[in-house]
Every structure is written in structure tokens, then in C-alpha cells.
Amino acid sequence: MGGYLLDTNIVSELRKQRPHGGVVAWLESVADADLYLSAVTLGEIQAGIELTREQDPIKASEIESWLEMVADAYNVLPMDAATFRAWARLMHRKSDTLYEDAMIGATANVHGLTVVTRNLADFRALGLRVFNPFDAV
């Protein structure tokens, strides 16, 4: 397939009032058809929305509306059987703290994508191709 799988920290950066210039510039330089999200990223952000909802339901609704737009704007890849099997291979003898990263990484692995993240160390530990757009400026 080729292309890029955006990690949760990249998607979250886009929600900021002033997202990092390197992230914005890099995203603008890549064709939309080459940008992907894992369903896991949507789940991670939704989990954060639910925590926010306990303190500030209005803000949670705003973020949830934003997340709906994000989900519609990107190619979202599911956690299917092949991806879960790749996840199990990546997780073998690894720390349980890498669960979500390994699921995102498995999605990238199955689809031949580079993980775009600020969190290079954990994804490199899983043997994945990574790119950090925060360093692109």
C-alpha cells in the first residue's frame, strides 16, 4: 500500500489552536490518499473524551464533533484478523505498556505504512518504520 499511518499524538496535535508548524507543513506536503489512521487512534481519543466528559460535558461534545470530522477526513484502517495476528507477533516478550502502540504499529506493518509519531522510541522498539514531523522544521 505505502503511505503513512498517523499516531494518536499527531492527530491530537491537530486539535491544538496552534499546531506545531512542522506537523502542519508535513501534512500539507503529503497527498490525502497516502494518510491513514488506525481505528485504535479513534478509540484512544474517544477514551480521552469520556474522561473529559466527567468534568466538562460541553468540551467533550466539542472534541467528539471534531473527532467525527477527523474520522470522515482520513482513511481509517480496522483492527482485523491479520492486524491482530501482527499485533501478537509485535507484543511477544514486550512490555504490556505498549498495547495501543503495538496495535497501531501492527496496522502499519500489515498495510506497509510508516508510522508518523513523536514517540519514536516505542515504535522503533517494535521494529517499525517511523517519521517524526516535529523534527521536520
Put a short name on every predicted segment.
Residues 131-137:
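Generic C-terminal helix-cap and adjacent flexible tail
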Residues 47-50, 61, 73-118, 137:
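Active-site neighborhoods of divalent-metal-dependent phosphate/nucleic-acid chemistry enzymes
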Residues 1-37, 41, 51-67, 137:
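Short, well-structured N-terminal submotif of metal-dependent ribonuclease cores
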Residues 36-38, 116, 131:
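Structural detector of well-ordered beta-strand residues that form the stable sheet scaffold
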